[in-house]
Amino acid sequence: IGKINDKPYEVFTGKSEDFYLPPYVESGWVTKKKKKGERTQYDFEFDDKQGYRIVLPALSRSFEQEFWNYAKLISGVLRHGMPLTYVMDLISNLTVPEDNINTWKNGVVRALKRYIPDGTIAVEKICPECREETVVYEDGCLICKSCGHTKCT
């Protein structure tokens, strides 16, 4: 997730068998390169365990085009100020080939949830326990303010 002023601004994501990151890498940087008359190139950089900068060039060629294009669309929506709860709802409603807990779209939604301020009202959510429309985000989880119901532990 790329941020400006601590708010999500763009998403770099896709599905790939060829994009390998060592397990110790928890963060890195995306750099943008634009040569006149050519397409923009995004590289991923991180520091290895010895502190050396490692560059994985051309992220867009590393990922399946369909998912890279989804990421570009999501980034455009974020840049134009759509509230995160609506962005997450949009992503959740995408139709992708697989639909289980570890899908690409669920991963993107989980990553974005971290940036929702506590107390933000959930989009069109009714509590399954008490049927009230008092569901809000707290620590990235949905919780009902009326009865306390949550799926997070």
Predicted regions and their residues:
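Long, C-terminal-biased catalytic regions of enzyme "large/alpha" subunits
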Residues: 1-153
